[in-house]
C-alpha cells in the first residue's frame, strides 16, 4: 500500500505497473537448468498468510544464496500476496503488466562447466540471456544446428500442460510431471493471474537471447517454436482480454547474426511476434533519462 501511495505521489499520471515476479535458475546449460521459487529464510512464516508457491511451502522451498550472512536476492512472493497486490492495483485504477522474471542464483566455485568456455565454473549471478546449450554455438562440440539442440531446449521448457493445473479454493494446484521447468513457471502464473480476474498484459518471457538463437537445423529455432506453443497455452488460460507478448533484449530483437562467417541474418523472432496470440512486440531497452 505504501509503495503504491509513493508511486502515485512521485508519478501522478501513472496508468500502468509492471509486476515482476522471479523464480531462480541454477545452471546456464538449458538441459541442466531448473527454475524454482525460493525464500530468503525459513526462520518464521507469515501469519495469517503462510508462504506458498506452486505447491512449495517455506519449509520445502529452496533458500536463495547468502554472501556474508546476507541473502543476495529477495525471495519469490507468496502467491496470495500477488493476488492481493493485483487486486489493490486494480482498485487504484492501474493496469497490471505481469512480468515473470528469471534470476540466476549461481555463486562462486559452483563447479558447473561454463558453456561459453573451458572454465570449470560458470560466472557468478549471470544474466538469464546467457542460458544456452550444453556448449554454446561456436564452441567445440556444441550441439547447435543438430537434433540434440532441440532436445536440450525441450528439457528446459519441460512437459507441463495446461491440464496439469487446477484452481482449487483460490489456489493454483499442479499435478503434472515432477519437474521445475519454464513451462511450469509461466503456466503457474498464468493461472494465478486468471484467479485475479486477469491482467492487462502478460509477458511469456523476456531477454532469453541465448535460447532463442539456438538452432536444431539451418533455419529452425526450437525455443521460438516452444514460445509459440506457450503463447497459445497462456491464451487458453487467460482468454482474449489479456495482451500477450515476449520482451526481447535490445541485442536480440533485430535478428540473429551467427558469427560463423556466413553473413546470414535470421529474423528468428518474427514467427512468434506474427502469430495471432501475440498482441505486442516487446523490447527491453535501458535508455538514459538524462545526460
Question: What do these predicted ranges mean?
Answer:
Residues 1-83, 88, 95, 99-181, ...:
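N-terminal substrate-binding region of glycoside hydrolase catalytic domains
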Residues 8, 83-90, 190-194, 235:
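A structural alpha-helix within SAM-dependent methyltransferase catalytic domains
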Amino acid at each position: 500500500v505504501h509503495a503504491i501511495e509513493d508511486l502515485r505521489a512521485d508519478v501522478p499520471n501513472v496508468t500502468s505497473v509492471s509486476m515482476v515476479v522471479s523464480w531462480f535458475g541454477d545452471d546456464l546449460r538449458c538441459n541442466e537448468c531448473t527454475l524454482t521459487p525460493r525464500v530468503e529464510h525459513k526462520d518464521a512464516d507469515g501469519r495469517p498468510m503462510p508462504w506458498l508457491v506452486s505447491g512449495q511451502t517455506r519449509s520445502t522451498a529452496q533458500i536463495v544464496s547468502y554472501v556474508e550472512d546476507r541473502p543476495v536476492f529477495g525471495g519469490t512472493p507468496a502467491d496470495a500476496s500477488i493476488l492481493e497486490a493485483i487486486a489493490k492495483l486494480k482498485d487504484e485504477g492501474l493496469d497490471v503488466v505481469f512480468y515473470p522474471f528469471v534470476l540466476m542464483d549461481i555463486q562462486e566455485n559452483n563447479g558447473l562447466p561454463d558453456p561459453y568456455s573451458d572454465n570449470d565454473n560458470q560466472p557468478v549471478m549471470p544474466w538469464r540471456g546467457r542460458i544456452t546449450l550444453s556448449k554454446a554455438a561456436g564452441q567445440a562440440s556444441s550441439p547447435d544446428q543438430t537434433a540434440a539442440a532441440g532436445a536440450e531446449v525441450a528439457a528446459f521448457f519441460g512437459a507441463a500442460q495446461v491440464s496439469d493445473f487446477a484452481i482449487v479454493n483460490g489456489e493454483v494446484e499442479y499435478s503434472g510431471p515432477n519437474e521445475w521447468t519454464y513451462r511450469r513457471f509461466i503456466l503457474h502464473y498464468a493461472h494465478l493471474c486468471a484467479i485475479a480476474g486477469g491482467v492487462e498484459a502478460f509477458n511469456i518471457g523476456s531477454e532469453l537471447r541465448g535460447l532463442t538463437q539456438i538452432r536444431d537445423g539451418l533455419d529452425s529455432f526450437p525455443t521460438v517454436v516452444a514460445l509459440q506453443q506457450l503463447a497459445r497455452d497462456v491464451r487458453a488460460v487467460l482468454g482474449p482480454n489479456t495482451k500477450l507478448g515476449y520482451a526481447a533484449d535490445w541485442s536480440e530483437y533485430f535478428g540473429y547474426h551467427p558469427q560463423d562467417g556466413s553473413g546470414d541474418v535470421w529474423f528468428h523472432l518474427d514467427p512468434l511476434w506474427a502469430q495471432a496470440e501475440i498482441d505486442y512486440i516487446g523490447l527491453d531497452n535501458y535508455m538514459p533519462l538524462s545526460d
